[in-house]
Amino acid sequence: MMTIAQIMEKMIAFSEGNIHDITHLSCVWTYAKTIGELEGLDADTQFILEVAAITHDIACPLCRKKYGNTNGKYQEQEGAPLVREFLADTGMTAEQIDRVAYLVGHHHSPAQINDRLLSDDGA
């Protein structure tokens, strides 16, 4: 399975050199990683959290081209299927990819995420 560093490298390449996108995903990942560690998440949940943080804005380049903006609604609509394709060759399980896709597809709609915990055990 790809490491977080390898997924980060892949996402940076996917960002087409957009410094804003790269800086933003790096900041979001740093915050998510730190919060997850401080909360004591298990290794799999921490991994999913970090991958979701790295890929949460994966649809931005496509949205800029297709819609002329990166509106959150468009990011959610385009992001979930795009992240599935992006993660297909990482060695992640289907369940892990499903969870990341769910988070990416709802990251501008937190009310829709609140009904579902980050992990099934309540962590």
Name these PLM-found stretches.
Residues 4-8, 29, 76-84, 101:
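An amphipathic alpha-helix signature
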Residues 92-123:
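Histidine/acidic-rich helix-loop-helix segments that form or flank divalent-metal centers
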Residues 13-17, 34-38, 60, 64, ...:
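General structural signal for alpha-helix termini and helix-helix connectors
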Residues 66-74, 87-92:
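Short coil/turn segments at secondary-structure boundaries
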Residues 3-27, 58-69:
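Active-site flanking loop/helix segments enriched in acidic
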Residues 24, 45-50, 75, 96-100, ...:
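Short, conserved alpha-helical segments within structured domains
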